[in-house]
């Protein structure tokens, strides 16, 4: 591919959107998080975008997702989850990250967004599922490449993730190579797995997206989520790999269309509950 062709491809696939504004969030456990806000000029729907393990809001695939959603008219707030990027704290691999989602969702509401959708990829997907499933307020939820259960060791990439989290040399490598600070000592108490709480998200609109070529979390993870969330929309994407790097412009278009429809439904007035005693 020549230079001109590469330039044209970039112009066609990366929307022209405003430069994101850096903002600070404070979590309920006292951490300061860096986040980037893409202001689309509207205050109808704000989207929290949560990255995966060792990612950040500054990573190119994450920025492309945020820019794409912004170009479709959504406000976007992408935090660096705890222990990642320029945020404080240590990564807890999905245990405490729902607090980061809560801080981001609260920021959007405080800044005038009428509705808030929470979207996450991989570890970020587990965070938004646990946030919403444990009672966090959201008008729509999207989880892409999320685990359904914990302690996946059946795939080579996840065995590497466990090494990074569970060993001193692994944590040092994650910090040196990716800038990710991981909490030592593991979980004092195993948190609820996404499959254990996903059913409680209903009636909030929920979309679960998973690739059939995901090398981290095989199909049993999305099957576990689907079994517990019969009202969810489940998309199994042919040929798709894992998380942000596998999210194509076409998939992002479809997620954007789903979000627009889902938040339109959420904004409709709910039917009144009939009170038989009052009617008699």
Positions of predicted regions on the chain:
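Short beta-strand/loop motif that positions the catalytic acidic residue
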Residues: 201-202, 208-210
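Catalytic histidine-centered segment of alpha/beta-hydrolase-like enzymes
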Residues: 240-252
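Hydrolase active-site cap/lid region
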Residues: 134-187, 204
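Catalytic nucleophile-loop/oxyanion-hole region of alpha/beta-hydrolase
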Residues: 82-113
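An N-terminal hydrophobic leader/cap segment in hydrolases
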Residues: 1-27, 31-40, 244, 271, ...
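Conserved alpha/beta-hydrolase
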Residues: 66-88
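The serine-hydrolase catalytic nucleophile loop
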Residues: 54-67, 81
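Conserved alpha/beta-hydrolase "acid-adjacent" motif
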Residues: 215-221
């Amino acid at each position: 591919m020549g230079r001109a062709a590469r330039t044209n491809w970039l112009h066609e696939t990366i929307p022209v959107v405003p430069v994101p504004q850096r903002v600070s969030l404070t979590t309920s456990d006292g951490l300061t998080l860096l986040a980037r806000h893409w202001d689309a000029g509207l205050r109808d729907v704000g989207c929290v975008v949560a990255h995966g393990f060792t990612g950040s809001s500054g990573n190119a695939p994450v920025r492309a997702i945020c820019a794409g959603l912004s170009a479709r008219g959504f406000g976007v707030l992408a935090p660096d989850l705890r222990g990642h990027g320029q945020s404080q704290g240590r990564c807890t691999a999905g245990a405490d990250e729902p607090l980061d989602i809560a801080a981001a969702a609260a920021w959007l509401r405080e800044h005038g967004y009428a509705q808030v959708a929470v979207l996450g990829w991989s570890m970020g997907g587990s965070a938004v599922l646990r946030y919403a499933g444990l009672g966090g307020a959201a008008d729509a939820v999207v989880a892409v490449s999320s685990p359904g259960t914990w302690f996946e060791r059946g795939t080579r990439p996840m065995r590497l993730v466990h090494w990074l989290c569970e060993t001193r040399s692994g944590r040092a490598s994650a910090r040196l190579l990716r800038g990710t600070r991981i909490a030592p000592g593991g979980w004092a108490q195993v948190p609820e797995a996404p499959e254990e709480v996903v059913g409680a998200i209903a009636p909030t609109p929920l979309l679960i997206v998973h690739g059939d070529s995901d090398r981290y979390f095989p199909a049993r993870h999305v099957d576990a989520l689907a079994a517990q969330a019969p009202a969810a929309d489940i998309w199994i994407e042919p040929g798709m790999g894992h998380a942000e790097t596998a999210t194509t412009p076409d998939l992002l278009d479809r997620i954007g269309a789903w979000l627009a429809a889902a938040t339109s439904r959420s904004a409709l007035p709910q039917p009144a509950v009939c009170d038989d005693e009052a009617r008699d």
